[in-house]
Amino acid sequence: LGMTSPDSGSISVFGHAGCSAKDREDIGVVFDELPFAQTLFISHLGRIMKGIYQNWDQKQYEEYLQKFALPDRKELKDFSRGMKMKLSLAVALSHNAKLLILDEPTSGLDPVVRAEILDIFLDFISDGEHSVLVSSHITSDLEKVADYITFIHQGKLMLCENKDNIIYGYGIAKADKATIDAIDSQFVLKKKHGKYDSEALVIDRAAFSRQYPEILVDPINLDELMLMLCSDK
C-alpha cells in the first residue's frame, strides 16, 4: 500500500514485485479503526470515494449500505464498532477490488455481526477470482474461513501452512520425556517438556501413528498449535 517500506525480504502483488497505483485500485483495505473523518455521513463518504477510485461503483456501495442497515442520518462518530466495520467493508467492496486486506476485522464484535462478516468474506472469494488476507487473533474465525494460516510471532515467521493440513494432519503426541525425545525428527515440528510429561507437535499424525502405534496422538486446533510453537521449553 506504500504506507511503509520493508526492512528485508521481498513481496509480490498480483504476481509481480512492488505495488503500483493500478494495483492499489484492485486492493480493498479494512483497518482496525475507521480511517475516515468522524463528522462525515455515509452519503458524503460515497462522494469522496468516487473521486478516489476510478472503478468506484456507487450503486454497489448503496446496496451494501442497505444490506448492512447503516443509518444515513448519523455522523460516523456515532456509529458502533460493528457499524464502522460494516461501513469499511462496504467501501472496500465497492470499487471492484480483487484482494481484501483486513486488520482484526471481527475483533470486539458480537457473534451475530462476526458471523455476518465472515459470510461476506466467503461470498467474496467464492468465484475463485478474489482473495482475502486477514490479520486476526481470533483463531476460531480463521478456522471457519481461511485456506492458509501464516503465524508470525515477535516478528518471526513461525509457520505457513494449508489450514486443512493443520486441522486434519497435525497433532499433539503426549508421553514421558524419554519417549518423546526418541521420536524421529521427521515427524516432529516442536517438542515441549513439562514437569510431569512431554509433548511433541506432530506434522502428520496418521503416518506418526503407523510408526508409533503405542504413543497417543490427538488432533490440534489453531490455539493449541500457536501456544506450542511459542513455547520455549
Residue ranges and their predicted role:
Residues G9-D23:
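Conserved ABC transporter NBD signature motif
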Residues L118-V202:
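ABC transporter nucleotide-binding domain
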